[in-house]
């Protein structure tokens, strides 16, 4: 039993990690001191005798030795042995990289006296973990009469307090990094642990690298110093390459085209589900991030915009898949005679019949001249009605160009109530939009200042001729009529 206990104790000591305390918390650690370099040579005659000196006095000679360590190390001691007693003046210099700059470590003047100084000289850096002599090259300069017989260097790998083991003979030397650091000298954080800036460990604080909060959707992140400052020094990591259709600094919301499934936790691979919007009934492939509701076209309803709403029926148009069901005896606007007794409608409309003489002046005063077909209508607030129209031809453009195809037009509710515009679904109209007032540049507006006349094929040629005259400059100098107010929308 005592033998078994001793073996378990030794095994526990061998497997203990010096970079973590018994509770598993990070702590400052250093690799062991090892022999970095050793140089030995025979002792030749340091300096030749001067031929003119019968007393045999020696001349002063100088020498230097540069050692390349193969990587950065923390030097702990430098031992020098000379061929004869009385070593010369010594200068030790260290450089962090090849080519310098060199930093003076130790300077020893020549020993006075005939016998000289000691045969061996040893330089020690600050003992313990506070050793600060970091170098990859060491230079020894000496002058005088003695020659250098041997030199030895001892030190440890530069791991910045984040490793207790090191492959010192590797080139460059590689530390077995802990505290979620990486690099030959543990000089940076792992790609997934960059929520705090990298710092070297100290005996008072190990400064481990902390993981970024990516909800298990990213394997790497980057450190942002500005976010770290704004957070009061709490967090500065930004997740990169979010997976599983997530996005954001912490991969905490879904990409466009996906929505958050509340039945799954945020760190689940199935936290984001595809919107599955209908390709014809929806305006696009995106949906609400919370509910998954797609943005439907006019008259279309459903979570994925896959059916027509109440009062609408399916059509064959991919751009307007649902049309309002027409009523048997009514149109979109009521005839003027039905409301002729309303005092507000008296002299309100532009009372013109279908016999319109389109002169060049009147053509130029219009905001737009279009041939369009009315498809459907729905209320858009208390003062406006939105019409779905299909523009078939454009004879006069607005300041904001009108394109051919399906789009929306806006009509004041009062103009329809008083019968200023007579519109029937499925019928082609010549739409004359007056430039009176200040039309919304982003919307196609039809009101009482313009006309909506049932289209007649014989109008096409005269309108083409007026269009050519406008392009030739025929509308220059023609002013629009006096403005009048429109309802707010």
Swiss-Prot record:
Alphabetic keyword roster: Developmental protein, Disulfide bond, Glycoprotein, Laminin EGF-like domain, Neurogenesis, Repeat, Secreted, Signal
Main location: secreted
One Pfam family here: EGF_LMN_ATRN
Chain positions covered by the region annotation Disordered: 470-489
Domain of life where this protein originates: Eukaryota
Residues with attached carbohydrate: 62
Stretches assigned to the Laminin EGF-like domain: 157-211, 212-274, 275-324
InterPro entries hit by this protein: Laminin/Netrin_ECM (IPR050440), LE_dom (IPR002049), LMN_ATRN_NET-like_EGF (IPR056863), Netrin_domain (IPR001134), Netrin_module_non-TIMP (IPR018933), TIMP-like_OB-fold (IPR008993)
Intrachain S-S bonds: 157-166, 159-175, 177-186, 189-209, 212-221, 214-239, 242-251, 254-272, 275-287, 277-294, 296-305, 308-322, 345-418, 349-420, 364-475
Domain named NTR: residues: 345-475
Signal peptide start and end residues: 1-16
UniProt-annotated location(s): Secreted
One Gene Ontology cellular component annotation held by this UniProt entry: extracellular region
CDD domains the UniProt entry points to: EGF_Lam, NTR_netrin-1_like
GO biological process, one term: neurogenesis
PROSITE patterns (UniProt xref): EGF_1, EGF_LAM_1, EGF_LAM_2, NTR
Biological role: Plays a role in neurogenesis. Prevents motor neuron cell body migration out of the neural tube.
Identification of the protein by name: Netrin-5
Gene: NTN5
């Amino acid at each position: 039993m005592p033998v078994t206990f001793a073996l378990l104790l030794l095994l526990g000591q061998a497997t203990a990690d010096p970079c973590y305390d018994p509770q598993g918390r990070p702590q400052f650690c250093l690799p062991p001191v090892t022999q970095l370099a050793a140089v030995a040579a025979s002792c030749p005659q340091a300096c030749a005798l001067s031929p003119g000196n019968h007393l045999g006095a020696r001349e002063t000679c100088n020498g230097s030795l540069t050692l390349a360590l193969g990587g950065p190390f923390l030097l702990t001691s430098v031992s020098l042995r000379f061929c004869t007693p009385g070593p010369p003046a010594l200068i030790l210099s260290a450089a962090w990289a090849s080519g310098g700059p060199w930093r003076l470590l130790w300077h020893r003047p020549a020993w006075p006296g005939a016998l000289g100084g000691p045969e061996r000289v040893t330089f020690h850096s600050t003992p313990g973990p506070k050793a600060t002599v970091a170098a990859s090259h060491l230079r020894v300069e000496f002058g005088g009469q003695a020659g250098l017989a041997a030199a030895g260097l001892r030190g440890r790998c530069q791991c910045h307090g984040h490793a207790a083991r090191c492959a010192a003979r590797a080139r460059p030397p590689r530390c077995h990094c802990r505290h979620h650091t990486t690099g030959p000298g543990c000089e940076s954080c792992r790609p997934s642990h960059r929520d705090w800036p990298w710092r070297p460990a100290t005996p008072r604080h190990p400064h481990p690298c902390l993981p970024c909060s990516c909800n298990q959707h990213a394997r790497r992140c980057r450190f942002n110093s500005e976010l770290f400052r704004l957070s009061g020094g709490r967090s500065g990591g930004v997740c990169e390459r979010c997976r599983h259709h997530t996005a954001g600094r912490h991969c905490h919301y879904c990409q466009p085209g996906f929505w958050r499934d509340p039945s799954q936790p945020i760190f689940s691979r199935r936290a984001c589900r595809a919107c599955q919007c209908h390709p014809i009934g929806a305006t696009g492939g995106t949906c609400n991030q919370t509910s998954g509701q797609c943005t439907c076209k006019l008259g279309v309803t459903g979570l994925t915009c896959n059916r027509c709403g109440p009062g609408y029926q399916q059509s064959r148009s991919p751009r307007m898949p649902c049309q309002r069901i027409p009523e048997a005896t009514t149109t979109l606007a009521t005839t003027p005679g039905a409301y002729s007794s309303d005092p507000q409608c008296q002299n309100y409309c532009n009372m013109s019949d279908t016999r319109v003489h389109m002169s060049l002046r009147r053509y130029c005063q219009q905001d737009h001249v279009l041939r369009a077909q009315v498809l459907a209508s729905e209320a858009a607030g208390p003062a406006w009605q939105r019409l779905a129209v299909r523009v078939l031809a454009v004879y006069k453009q607005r300041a904001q160009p009108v394109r051919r195809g399906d789009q929306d037009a806006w009509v004041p509710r009062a103009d329809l109530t008083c019968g200023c515009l007579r519109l029937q679904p499925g019928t082609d109209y010549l739409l004359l939009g007056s430039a009176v007032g200040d039309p919304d540049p982003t919307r196609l507006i039809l009101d009482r200042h313009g006309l909506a006349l049932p289209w007649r094929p014989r109008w096409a040629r005269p309108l083409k001729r007026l269009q050519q005259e406008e392009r030739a400059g025929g509308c220059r100098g023609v002013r629009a009529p006096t403005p009048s107010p429109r309802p707010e929308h």
